[in-house]
């Protein structure tokens, strides 16, 4: 990982009020106070990466004020917004633009990972909420993030994977 390649992301995080430290092969981000609202426009490289948009959307859902995200690269990238709303986020989507009105905190909820990026965003949102959230359809997450549960636990996250018996199989038993 080269921190220089993350410049569009780290610049936005700094603008949101975070402290960002760059090392040779790593970046450390710390919250230093209130999260400030942002305007984000996704762009092809070297602009703000569309793959980071759902994760930034989670951050903006608890920013102090109104943020806008314009998705210029992919259609349907805002599929995660319905899941954030289940957690109490205030987000309105009109075409390729999402407007986030920051709330004080997110609440736990049953969630769904509709794709890889949305799944990562739901994991972060669930970790931000006080209480237990369950995320279904985690295959997307596991495909894109090897050993995510163990890695997040290593960072201090209270996270676990629960194996469920499919309802149809459970009824047959």
Name every feature range the model reports, one short phrase each.
Residues 1-173:
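Short, structured segments at the rim of ligand-binding sites
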């Amino acid at each position: 990982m080269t921190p220089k390649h993350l410049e569009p992301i780290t610049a936005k995080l700094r603008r949101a009020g975070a402290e960002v430290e760059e090392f040779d092969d790593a970046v450390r981000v710390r919250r230093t106070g209130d999260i400030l609202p942002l305007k984000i426009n996704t762009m092809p490289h070297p602009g703000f990466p569309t793959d980071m948009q759902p994760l930034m959307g989670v951050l903006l859902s608890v920013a102090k004020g109104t943020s806008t995200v314009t998705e210029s690269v992919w259609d349907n990238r805002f599929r995660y917004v319905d899941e954030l709303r289940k957690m109490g986020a205030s987000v309105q989507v009109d075409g390729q633009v999402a407007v986030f009105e920051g709330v004080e905190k997110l609440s736990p909820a049953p969630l769904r990972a509709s794709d890889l990026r949305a799944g990562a965003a739901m994991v972060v949102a669930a970790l931000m909420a006080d209480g237990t959230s369950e995320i279904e359809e985690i295959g997307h997450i596991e495909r894109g993030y090897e050993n995510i549960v163990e890695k997040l636990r290593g960072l201090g996250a209270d996270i676990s994977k629960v194996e469920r018996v499919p309802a149809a199989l459970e009824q047959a038993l």
